[in-house]
Curated annotation (Swiss-Prot):
InterPro entries (UniProt xref): AAA+_ATPase, ABC_SmlMolc_Importer, ABC_transporter-like_ATP-bd, ABC_transporter-like_CS, P-loop_NTPase, Thiamine_ABC_ThiQ
One Pfam match: ABC_tran
Keywords: ATP-binding, Cell inner membrane, Cell membrane, Membrane, Nucleotide-binding, Translocase, Transport
Assigned GO CC terms: plasma membrane
Protein name (database record): Thiamine import ATP-binding protein ThiQ
Boundaries of every ABC transporter domain copy: 2-230
S-S bonds: none
UniProt EC number: 7.6.2.15
Similarity field: Belongs to the ABC transporter superfamily. Thiamine importer (TC 3.A.1.19.1) family.
Subunit structure, as described in the record: The complex is composed of two ATP-binding proteins (ThiQ), two transmembrane proteins (ThiP) and a solute-binding protein (ThiB).
Cell location: Cell inner membrane
């Protein structure tokens, strides 16, 4: 589904270089120290950064130079980027038509995702009238209503309390499994990664330093566990 082949981006003349393959329907966590290049990797996939070299394939098609708006990708950030002057219904509708002129089919898609997110009763409210968790549900709904096969999450739930964060992670995982979406999620928490991502990637110094089973990383048995401050549980 998703393949990066020597995708390179120059950061202060120092190259970050990524080679990666992710299958359709996989849920993968991206972990690593602060400043390692995790968000850079997602931004390269989404098209917000242009690589200096390399190839990016999605579903077998070359999207190395495709503008972000035309890539088969949706991305959700920690800052949800909801428009404060638009209500929930309109914010979700932006994912279908920036002009907010929706046909009957699009209106049904909008309403269906709102029901799935549990926010159908909030459709006439403005973002400022919502809790943090509700705002992230609206932002996630706007991503999912686009029906793109790849979903990128850049720590969108890190500001939520542990109970809400776990609730959102479970919701995302269930939807991705139901729709066979390919998920890549940046996180600082290996525990969060283990909840939804059987596979993890560790980024360090602008490279993929390790990839494998999240459980192995969490147990301290992986070579990259020390990068995340995880010690082996074996005495």
């Amino acid at each position: 589904m998703l393949k990066l082949i020597d995708i390179t981006w120059l950061y202060h003349h120092l190259p970050m270089r990524f080679t990666l393959a992710v299958e359709r329907g996989e849920q993968v966590a991206i972990l690593g120290p602060s400043g390692a290049g995790k968000s850079t990797l997602l931004n390269l996939i989404a098209g917000f950064l242009a690589p200096a070299s390399g190839t990016l394939l999605i579903a077998g098609e070359d999207h190395t130079l495709t503008p972000p708006s035309r890539r088969p990708v949706s991305m959700l950030f920690q800052e949800n980027n909801l428009f404060s002057h638009l209500n929930v219904q309109q914010n979700i509708g932006l994912g279908l038509n920036p002009g907010l002129t929706l046909n009957a089919s699009q209106r049904e898609k909008r309403d269906a995702i709102a029901r799935q997110m549990g926010i159908e009763s909030l459709m006439t409210r403005l973002p400022g009238e919502l809790s943090g968790g509700q705002r992230q549900r609206v932002a996630l709904a706007r991503c999912l209503v686009r029906e793109q096969p790849v979903l990128l999450l850049d720590e969108p739930f890190s500001a939520l309390d542990p109970t809400l964060r776990q609730e959102m992670l479970t919701l995302v995982s269930d939807i991705c499994r139901e729709r066979q979406l390919t998920l890549l999620m940046v996180s600082h928490s290996v525990e969060d990664a283990a909840r939804i991502a059987p596979r993890s990637i560790v980024v360090a110094d602008g490279r993929i330093a390790w990839q494998g089973k999240t459980d192995e990383l969490l147990s301290g048995q992986a070579s990259a566990s020390a990068l995340l401050g995880i010690k082996s549980h074996i005495l």
